[in-house]
Amino acid sequence: MAPCVHPCQSCRLRALEAFTPVTPQELDFIQAFRNGTTTVAAGGAIIQEQKPNGKLFTLYAGWAFRYKTLQDGRRQILNFLLPGDLVGLQQQFADGAMHGVEAITDVQLCVFARDGLWDLYRAHPSLGYDLTWLAARGEGMVDDNLVTTGRRNAAE
Protein backbone atom coordinates (compact mmCIF):
# COMPACT_ATOMS: atom_id res chain seq x y z
CA MET A 1 0.00 0.00 0.00
CA ALA A 2 1.27 3.44 -0.84
CA PRO A 3 2.11 5.86 1.96
CA CYS A 4 -0.31 8.66 2.80
CA VAL A 5 0.48 11.18 0.08
CA HIS A 6 -1.79 13.91 1.38
CA PRO A 7 -2.72 14.57 4.99
CA CYS A 8 -6.40 14.67 5.85
CA GLN A 9 -5.96 18.28 7.00
CA SER A 10 -5.33 19.37 3.40
CA CYS A 11 -7.74 16.98 1.67
CA ARG A 12 -9.37 18.72 -1.29
CA LEU A 13 -12.57 16.72 -0.75
CA ARG A 14 -13.18 18.46 2.58
CA ALA A 15 -13.86 21.69 0.69
CA LEU A 16 -16.83 20.14 -1.13
CA GLU A 17 -20.25 21.32 -0.03
CA ALA A 18 -21.37 17.76 0.76
CA PHE A 19 -18.83 17.43 3.58
CA THR A 20 -19.69 18.65 7.05
CA PRO A 21 -17.04 20.50 9.04
CA VAL A 22 -15.16 18.45 11.64
CA THR A 23 -13.39 19.49 14.82
CA PRO A 24 -9.59 19.40 15.01
CA GLN A 25 -9.89 16.35 17.30
CA GLU A 26 -12.11 14.55 14.79
CA LEU A 27 -9.69 15.37 12.00
CA ASP A 28 -6.79 13.98 14.04
CA PHE A 29 -8.81 10.80 14.64
CA ILE A 30 -9.59 10.44 10.92
CA GLN A 31 -5.90 10.87 10.08
CA ALA A 32 -4.92 8.20 12.63
CA PHE A 33 -7.74 5.91 11.43
CA ARG A 34 -6.50 6.10 7.84
CA ASN A 35 -3.94 3.41 6.96
CA GLY A 36 -2.75 5.01 3.76
CA THR A 37 -3.78 5.30 0.15
CA THR A 38 -3.87 2.93 -2.76
CA THR A 39 -4.52 3.14 -6.47
CA VAL A 40 -6.49 0.78 -8.68
CA ALA A 41 -6.24 0.85 -12.47
CA ALA A 42 -9.34 1.20 -14.63
CA GLY A 43 -11.11 -2.17 -14.78
CA GLY A 44 -9.50 -3.36 -11.55
CA ALA A 45 -11.35 -4.73 -8.54
CA ILE A 46 -11.59 -2.54 -5.46
CA ILE A 47 -13.81 -5.04 -3.64
CA GLN A 48 -14.51 -8.58 -4.82
CA GLU A 49 -17.90 -10.16 -4.19
CA GLN A 50 -18.10 -12.66 -1.31
CA LYS A 51 -14.52 -11.95 -0.23
CA PRO A 52 -13.87 -10.10 3.02
CA ASN A 53 -10.99 -7.66 2.89
CA GLY A 54 -11.17 -5.84 6.23
CA LYS A 55 -10.97 -2.39 4.66
CA LEU A 56 -13.10 0.67 4.14
CA PHE A 57 -12.25 3.20 1.46
CA THR A 58 -13.00 6.76 0.54
CA LEU A 59 -12.84 7.33 -3.19
CA TYR A 60 -10.40 10.23 -3.47
CA ALA A 61 -10.08 10.47 -7.26
CA GLY A 62 -11.65 8.70 -10.22
CA TRP A 63 -14.92 6.85 -10.82
CA ALA A 64 -16.05 3.35 -9.86
CA PHE A 65 -19.24 1.30 -9.76
CA ARG A 66 -20.85 -1.22 -7.43
CA TYR A 67 -22.29 -4.36 -9.02
CA LYS A 68 -23.88 -7.69 -8.24
CA THR A 69 -23.14 -10.80 -10.31
CA LEU A 70 -26.18 -12.93 -11.13
CA GLN A 71 -26.15 -16.75 -11.17
CA ASP A 72 -25.84 -16.85 -14.96
CA GLY A 73 -22.79 -14.55 -14.91
CA ARG A 74 -24.50 -11.32 -15.92
CA ARG A 75 -23.69 -8.25 -13.84
CA GLN A 76 -26.16 -5.68 -12.59
CA ILE A 77 -24.70 -2.26 -11.89
CA LEU A 78 -26.09 -1.01 -8.58
CA ASN A 79 -24.70 2.51 -8.60
CA PHE A 80 -21.78 4.69 -9.57
CA LEU A 81 -19.21 6.01 -7.10
CA LEU A 82 -17.61 9.44 -7.29
CA PRO A 83 -14.89 11.20 -5.29
CA GLY A 84 -15.90 11.46 -1.64
CA ASP A 85 -18.02 8.31 -1.62
CA LEU A 86 -17.47 5.79 1.18
CA VAL A 87 -16.83 2.28 -0.13
CA GLY A 88 -17.14 -0.99 1.77
CA LEU A 89 -19.33 -0.10 4.74
CA GLN A 90 -21.77 -2.91 3.92
CA GLN A 91 -19.02 -5.47 4.53
CA GLN A 92 -19.02 -4.47 8.20
CA PHE A 93 -22.29 -6.33 8.63
CA ALA A 94 -21.68 -9.41 6.46
CA ASP A 95 -19.16 -12.19 5.95
CA GLY A 96 -17.65 -10.79 2.78
CA ALA A 97 -18.90 -8.26 0.30
CA MET A 98 -22.45 -8.67 -0.94
CA HIS A 99 -21.43 -6.80 -4.09
CA GLY A 100 -18.28 -6.00 -6.02
CA VAL A 101 -16.73 -2.61 -6.72
CA GLU A 102 -14.75 -2.00 -9.91
CA ALA A 103 -12.80 1.05 -11.06
CA ILE A 104 -14.16 2.70 -14.21
CA THR A 105 -11.16 5.01 -14.44
CA ASP A 106 -7.86 4.87 -12.60
CA VAL A 107 -8.80 5.59 -8.99
CA GLN A 108 -7.04 6.68 -5.83
CA LEU A 109 -8.52 5.58 -2.52
CA CYS A 110 -7.91 6.45 1.10
CA VAL A 111 -7.79 3.20 3.07
CA PHE A 112 -9.16 2.61 6.57
CA ALA A 113 -9.05 -0.53 8.72
CA ARG A 114 -12.61 -1.77 9.12
CA ASP A 115 -11.94 -3.00 12.65
CA GLY A 116 -11.36 0.61 13.75
CA LEU A 117 -14.94 1.56 12.93
CA TRP A 118 -16.23 0.85 16.44
CA ASP A 119 -13.53 3.10 17.87
CA LEU A 120 -14.86 5.87 15.65
CA TYR A 121 -18.41 5.40 16.96
CA ARG A 122 -17.22 5.37 20.59
CA ALA A 123 -14.73 8.23 20.43
CA HIS A 124 -16.57 10.52 18.00
CA PRO A 125 -20.33 9.89 17.94
CA SER A 126 -20.89 12.80 15.54
CA LEU A 127 -18.70 11.06 12.95
CA GLY A 128 -20.61 7.85 13.64
CA TYR A 129 -23.82 9.73 13.01
CA ASP A 130 -22.42 10.95 9.68
CA LEU A 131 -21.68 7.34 8.66
CA THR A 132 -25.17 6.28 9.73
CA TRP A 133 -26.63 9.14 7.69
CA LEU A 134 -24.62 8.03 4.64
CA ALA A 135 -25.92 4.48 5.02
CA ALA A 136 -29.51 5.70 5.41
CA ARG A 137 -29.13 7.96 2.37
CA GLY A 138 -27.84 5.00 0.37
CA GLU A 139 -30.79 2.90 1.48
CA GLY A 140 -33.15 5.67 0.38
CA MET A 141 -31.55 5.76 -3.07
CA VAL A 142 -31.88 1.97 -3.36
CA ASP A 143 -35.57 2.23 -2.38
CA ASP A 144 -36.13 4.91 -5.02
CA ASN A 145 -34.38 2.81 -7.68
CA LEU A 146 -36.54 -0.19 -6.77
CA VAL A 147 -39.73 1.85 -7.10
CA THR A 148 -38.52 3.20 -10.45
CA THR A 149 -37.76 -0.30 -11.71
CA GLY A 150 -40.90 -1.92 -10.37
CA ARG A 151 -43.72 0.59 -10.52
CA ARG A 152 -43.03 3.92 -12.23
CA ASN A 153 -44.10 4.42 -15.81
CA ALA A 154 -41.90 6.21 -18.36
CA ALA A 155 -43.48 9.62 -17.67
CA GLU A 156 -42.84 9.34 -13.94
Predicted regions: what they are:
Residues L86, L117-W118:
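A generic structural signal for short hydrophobic patches within well-formed alpha-helices
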Residues R122, S126-E156:
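Polybasic "coupling" helices that flank or enter modular domains
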Residues G43-I47, V147-G150:
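Short, solvent-exposed loop/turn elements at beta->coil junctions and helix N-caps
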Residues A18, G44-D106:
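Cyclic nucleotide-binding regulatory domains
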Residues M1-A42, L86-V87, Q92, A123:
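Cyclic nucleotide-binding regulatory module and flanking cytosolic helices
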